[in-house]
């Protein structure tokens, strides 16, 4: 079983931000998006989604995008493409489904981060953690764009955060969801948030302010 933790009498630390990009094909577009976002607030990690391309092109994109992200103190994780993460200098990969997670663990651990998403059940989440995943994510949309009800997502996040030591990432589809997900160690800001018409800096600053307000409530 995944490691369970005893009940805590201390306040839970404020959740940190985890940015999810839209599918990017151009390193300059990534810089234009991530540079202002990472300067606006403390960000723990960036989940980089890449537009389809051949392997060499993908590696070159990651190699260009990784250093500025890492220089800001954020981990760069690649969505899928576990085999490219180490070769391109990323900090790890985020995989969807327990089978993909377990395969990535064999090739990336212990040097790199392996995150687990697309977990259909509590059992899958516990299995991912037991297998060695560094975090589990709840609430992200499936390939068809569907996600569980928000109430179910919040319940799953609160259950996990209360019981297990492995961190969880709660996926916020909108800024309004952030305040309801603060039990998680990390809040993932969806591509629609990061691509806010006000600009990435304003969106990330807004998200950080909401987290700060919840921590003081």
Regions found by a protein language model. Name each.
Residues 115-148:
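Histidine/lysine/aspartate-rich catalytic loop segments that bind and position anionic ligands
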Residues 45-57, 140-147:
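Glycine-rich, proline-tolerant flexible connector loops at the mouths of alpha/beta enzymes
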Residues 45-47, 77, 94, 137, ...:
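Conserved beta-strand positions in the central sheet of alpha/beta enzyme cores
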Residues 59-78, 97-120, 148-175, 207-217:
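Alpha-helix-loop-beta-strand connector modules within alpha/beta enzyme cores
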């Amino acid at each position: 079983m995944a490691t369970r933790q005893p009940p805590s009498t201390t306040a839970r630390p404020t959740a940190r931000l985890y940015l999810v990009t839209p599918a990017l094909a151009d390193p300059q577009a990534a810089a234009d998006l991530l540079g202002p976002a990472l300067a606006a607030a403390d960000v723990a990690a960036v989940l980089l989604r890449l537009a389809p391309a051949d392997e060499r092109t993908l590696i070159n994109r990651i190699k260009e995008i990784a250093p500025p992200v890492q220089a800001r103190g954020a981990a760069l994780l690649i969505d899928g493409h576990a085999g490219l993460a180490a070769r391109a200098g990323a900090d790890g990969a985020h995989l969807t489904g327990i089978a993909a997670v377990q395969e990535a663990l064999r090739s990336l651990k212990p040097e790199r981060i392996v995150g687990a998403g697309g977990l259909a059940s509590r059992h899958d989440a516990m299995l991912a953690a037991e297998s060695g995943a560094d975090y589990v994510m709840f609430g992200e949309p499936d390939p068809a764009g569907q996600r569980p009800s928000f109430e179910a997502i919040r319940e799953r996040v609160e259950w996990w955060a209360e019981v297990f030591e492995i961190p969880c990432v709660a996926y916020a589809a909108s800024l309004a969801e952030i305040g309801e997900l603060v039990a998680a160690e990390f809040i993932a800001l969806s591509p629609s948030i990061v691509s806010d018409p006000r600009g990435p800096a304003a969106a990330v600053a807004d998200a950080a302010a909401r987290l700060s307000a919840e921590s003081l409530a």
